[in-house]
C-alpha cells in the first residue's frame, strides 16, 4: 500500500500564498476614488458654482430656503385647488 499524503501540506500553503498575493496586487492596482477611476468628468463642473473662487452664480441660502418653501406651498395649493374644483 502506498503511503497517503495528508490533506493540506506544502502545495495548499503555496496556493494560499499565491492567492493572497494576487488579491494584494489587485487591491493596490484598483483606484480608490472615482476621480482616479475616470468617472469624475472634468473639473469645470456644476460644483464650480459653489466654490469661493468661482465667478459663477451666487445665491444666499435664505433665498434658496424661501424659494423652496414657496415651491412646496404652490404645489400644495395646486393640489387643493384641483381637489375642490373636481367636487363641484
From Swiss-Prot:
Keywords in alphabetical order: Endoplasmic reticulum, Membrane, Protein transport, Translocation, Transmembrane, Transmembrane helix, Transport
Gene Ontology MF terms in the entry: guanyl-nucleotide exchange factor activity
Location within or outside the cell: Endoplasmic reticulum membrane
A Pfam short name: Sec61_beta
Entry GO terms, CC: endoplasmic reticulum membrane; membrane; nuclear inner membrane; Sec61 translocon complex; Ssh1 translocon complex
Superkingdom classification of source: Eukaryota
Mode of membrane association: Single-pass membrane protein
Segments traversing the membrane: 62-82
Role: Part of the Ssh1 complex, which probably is the major component of a channel-forming translocon complex that may function exclusively in the cotranslational pathway of protein endoplasmic reticulum (ER) import.
UniProt protein name: Protein transport protein SBH2
Naturally occurring in which organism (per UniProt): Saccharomyces cerevisiae (strain ATCC 204508 / S288c)
Lineage of origin: Eukaryota, Fungi, Dikarya, Ascomycota, Saccharomycotina
Amino acid at each position: 500500500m502506498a503511503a497517503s499524503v495528508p490533506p493540506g501540506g506544502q502545495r495548499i500553503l503555496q496556493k494560499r500564498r499565491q492567492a493572497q498575493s494576487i488579491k494584494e496586487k489587485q487591491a493596490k492596482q484598483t483606484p480608490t476614488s472615482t476621480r482616479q477611476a475616470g468617472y469624475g468628468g472634468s473639473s469645470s463642473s456644476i460644483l464650480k458654482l459653489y466654490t469661493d473662487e468661482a465667478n459663477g452664480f451666487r445665491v444666499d441660502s435664505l433665498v434658496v430656503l424661501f424659494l423652496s418653501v414657496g415651491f412646496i406651498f404652490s404645489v400644495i395649493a395646486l393640489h387643493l385647488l384641483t381637489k375642490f374644483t373636481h367636487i363641484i
